[in-house]
Every structure is written in structure tokens, then in C-alpha cells.
Amino acid sequence: MWILLAYIALIAGINWIYEITPLVTLPGGDLWSPVDIIVGFVFVIRDFAQRRVGHYVLLAMLAGIAISWLTVSKELAFASAAAFAVGELADWAIFTATGKPFSQRILLSSLLGAPLDSLVFLTLVGLASPLAMQVQISSKLGGALLVFYLVWRREKRAAIPRGS
């Protein structure tokens, strides 16, 4: 149950932090939010939550969006809700459809979900540009890749017979 509460809190918390964190100007004048670095972990937490509670994770996503609607600007809440609807549902579908090991499902679902989420979110908040997209997607995937690697190593160690 704690994983669902963590997922809900992350959705609402990320939106609140996004709203109060100043944007960084990138070369060429594009804007980027440092919060993007931690957003990738939300995709991974969703994967852990889905592994634990199945499709109920979608209800947790709706709860996080509802809290965001009450705590941040309506523009940000709408952009976040739309991005979550597209990115997280794609992430959920890939995670559900593949019968691959957990680490691979984390990687595959993030590779699809992060770009979709970024495209929708940045477009709706008026910050979409090629550089901003690249930086946001890279930031999100960085967190997902770190967790993928850690889970993959654990799976690999667990597959090695003791005494070998």
C-alpha cells in the first residue's frame, strides 16, 4: 500500500515543485526545469506500484492528478494530467503487455512513456522546442536507466546459483 501512496504523493509533489522551481535558460534561450531530473523516477515508481497492486495503479494516478488539480495552477494541472494520461498509459500498456523480466519492463516502458509525456507536457505549457524536449527526455530517462541498472544487477545476481 505504501507504494501507491508514494506514487500519489510523487505525482502531486512533482507538480507542486515544478510550479515553484525557477526555470533554467539553456543555450539558445530554451527553458528547462531542473525538476525533470526526478520526474523519471515517477515512471519507475509506477512500475513498482503496478507490480505490487496491478491495475489499481491507474486509480492512484487519478488520485495524484486530482490532488494536483487542487494544489497547482489549472494550466499546470491540465498539462500534467494530459501528459500522465498519454505517457503513463503508454508506460502501463508496455509494462502490462510484455512478459519480460522486471528490469526490461522498466526500461521499455520508460523509453516509450518518457518521450510521450514530455511531448504532451512541454507542448501544453508552451515550452516545447527540440532542445527542451531532448533535455527533458534525457533527464527523465536518466532516472529510469539508473533504476533499470540496479534492478537488472539484482536479477542477474539472483539468477546465479549459490556456490558457483
Where do the language-model regions lie?
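Hydrophobic transmembrane alpha-helices
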Residues: 1-49
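Cytoplasmic-side transmembrane-helix entry/capping segments in multi-pass membrane proteins
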Residues: 2-4, 53-63, 101-110
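Helix-coil boundary and interhelical linker segments in multi-pass alpha-helical membrane proteins
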Residues: 19-27, 70-76, 125-131
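Hydrophobic alpha-helical membrane-insertion segments
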Residues: 24, 45, 55, 63, ...
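Helix-adjacent hinge/juxtasegments
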Residues: 56-88
